[in-house]
Amino acid sequence: MNIQGCTVLVIGANGVFGRLTAEKLLAMGANVIGTARSNESAANLPGGLTQGLLLDLESAESIATLTGYLSTSGVQLDGIINLAGVVGFGSTSDTSASDAQKLMQVNHLGPSAVISALLPVLAKSEREPFVLSITGVVAEKVFPGMSAYLTSKTAHSTWLKALNLEARRMKIRVIDVRPGHTETGLASRAVFGVAPAFPQGMTAEHVVGKIVEAIVSGKTELASTDF
């Protein structure tokens, strides 16, 4: 796939993965629309974006506003990249329903709602349209002390597999990306609990390089072993 000239929506472009991915796509000649959750976090969006938009994945109103705008503005999307996410730590018995719901909403329900609403826009693309979402090694392996996070990411990975089958008729490629632990600082920003001691992870630059390579080369998944 030739990235130059494509218009790509990057959800979570203010985060480490999102910002690096947006910058790499911009350097390759893409038009990038990036989202951030709030005006405060929008300060971390990269320069050079075609548009910077607000998207709170915990707000149905925010999701409807963004998808409604992109569906009616005349913007032709060629790709959607979801790199937003939150993490929490704790045993099953110590994790509250509200904490588990927050992870499910941000990591799965919110992104899937955005992607689903924008599929008709993507389907009009003549540039090999694609959806890419990051789920992680936790969608392949079970780890103790993070059941709510595992559940949210596994749910999203399963949803992506189903979407891949359904989107074929629209000629939309779906890419599930499952890197192992990466040094983005996410674990230190857990919405609940305290992260265990992880071994040294991969660099975010390495993971983003693999992500962009997967888009260009036509892959439909990047397993943890591909990193």
Model segments located where?
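Catalytic loop of short-chain dehydrogenase/reductase
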Residues: 123-124, 130-155, 160-161, 165-168
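Conserved glycine-rich Rossmann-like NAD(P)H-binding loop of the short-chain dehydrogenase/reductase
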Residues: 28-43
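Rossmann-fold cofactor-recognition segment
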Residues: 47-61
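Substrate-binding pocket helix/loop in short-chain dehydrogenase/reductase
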Residues: 91-92, 99-103
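C-terminal helical subdomain
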Residues: 169, 176-177, 192-227
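N-terminal Rossmann NAD(P)H-binding glycine-rich loop of SDR-like oxidoreductase domains
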Residues: 14, 22
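Conserved NAD(P)H cofactor-binding loop of Rossmann-fold oxidoreductase domains
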Residues: 83-89
